[in-house]
Amino acid sequence: MSRNLELFERGKQVIPGGVNSPVRAFGQVGGTPRFVARAEGAYFWDADGKQYLDYVGSWGPAIVGHAHPEVVKAVQDAAVGGLSFGAPTEGEVVIAEEICKLLPSVEQVRLVSSGTEATMTAIRLARGFTGRDLIVKFEGCYHGHSDSLLVKAGSGLLTFGNPSSGGVPADFTKHTLVLQYNDVEQLSRTFAEIGDKIACVILEPIAGNMNLIQPSREFVQALRQLTEKHGAVLIYDEVMTGFRVAKGCAQGLHGVTPDLTTLGKVVGGGMPLAAFGGRADIMGKIAPLGTVYQAGTLSGNPLSVAAGLATLKLIQQPGFYETLGSRTARLAQGLAEEARKAGVTLSTDSVGGMFGFYFSDKAPKSYAEATGCDIERFKRFFHAMLDEGVYFAPSAYEAGFVSAAHSEQMIESTLAAAGRAFARL
């Protein structure tokens, strides 16, 4: 028995499903999850000692590569001074200043420990600020696992209160409306009918939880115009895209100024750190200034802040995003080329350090189109690449990530492996 399988079987005895986050269980692709023993740069080594070129990168945070010496040293230095205090630190002020400097839309920011905390509190804050209850999200966009946001969409103009998880009462989600991503007409009709009742609209400005779907310019412009017109709060959930697609995040690429922004992943440099921030008048409603409550024992943890500050310093080096973007684009375009040579139908896309590939004849623009891709072919390709020592996300609905540690040679070796894998399909 392999060490990976042994650990998986042991884990299932004491951890539900053997993992601490569902996608890690290889449920969609089948087989045995790889238990990571260590990671460095663009690689990780599993419990059996096999090396993999990693395009998951901890689901996005590892933008400078695993175990970057400057990030590791920052965490080590912070640990010597204590692990947690339950009191404010200078580092919290410094990283807040850095976030506000990088994102003009963020006038004030609050640190939390997870993306779920960030989006959950941003929703609560928007409701407290507007005095309204209704929230709008989009089908296929994931915003963490708080009850109000675990809602799936159905047919028709709106879907009221359809929880997509057990244990979520319908009463918790009856104020959540689900619309179609990139559907400007539906969005406009919704605001025309009930715009004065909507507290906020939350979206992934580049959807990374239905593979990779970019919004149309018309869609993001309509979002900003309609929310402003009706007094609703526009929330850009940049937990995944924040500092991953550009130094100014997705909002900078779109030329949109949201009212609130949520951050995570990259901002913590691989440690548990997230944030929400935005307009000062909205942020002024949060406790202790206002009546909207939020708190956390480990919020602003000094080790997480140290890792985040070190990472934010590294990504601001000249040419960082130009190099990252060009290598990611080469990977995406190269995958399409290798598939074409093998006679395999494949579409690809990339933005900044994120990429997606889909076994369909065109890149999807909505959840319905994303779920129409050939999942069986994806499974075979995933395992073929795993055999080649290349680790892609074990789900057809997750974006991939390139780091600064991925060299041109690594990208080319990945494409050569993909050519062999496509030939096996």
UniProtKB/Swiss-Prot annotation:
One of its GO terms (molecular function) is transaminase activity. Transmembrane segments: none annotated. Its cofactor is pyridoxal 5'-phosphate. Its main location: cytoplasm. GO terms for biological process: protoporphyrinogen IX biosynthetic process. It comes from the Bacteria. It catalyses: (S)-4-amino-5-oxopentanoate = 5-aminolevulinate. Pfam families: Aminotran_3 (PF00202). The modification N6-(pyridoxal phosphate)lysine is found at residue 265. InterPro entries: 4pyrrol_synth_GluAld_NH2Trfase (IPR004639), Aminotrans_3 (IPR005814), Aminotrans_3_PPA_site (IPR049704), PyrdxlP-dep_Trfase (IPR015424), PyrdxlP-dep_Trfase_major (IPR015421), PyrdxlP-dep_Trfase_small (IPR015422). CDD domains: OAT_like. Pathway: Porphyrin-containing compound metabolism; protoporphyrin-IX biosynthesis; 5-aminolevulinate from L-glutamyl-tRNA(Glu): step 2/2. One of its GO terms (cellular component) is cytoplasm. Its EC number is 5.4.3.8. It is found in: Cytoplasm. Keywords: Cytoplasm, Isomerase, Porphyrin biosynthesis, Pyridoxal phosphate. Homodimer. PANTHER family: GLUTAMATE-1-SEMIALDEHYDE 2,1-AMINOMUTASE (PTHR43713), GLUTAMATE-1-SEMIALDEHYDE 2,1-AMINOMUTASE 1, CHLOROPLASTIC-RELATED (PTHR43713:SF3). Belongs to the class-III pyridoxal-phosphate-dependent aminotransferase family. HemL subfamily. This is Glutamate-1-semialdehyde 2,1-aminomutase. It comes from Chromobacterium violaceum (strain ATCC 12472 / DSM 30191 / JCM 1249 / CCUG 213 / NBRC 12614 / NCIMB 9131 / NCTC 9757 / MK). The lineage of its organism: Bacteria, Pseudomonadati, Pseudomonadota, Betaproteobacteria, Neisseriales. The gene is hemL.
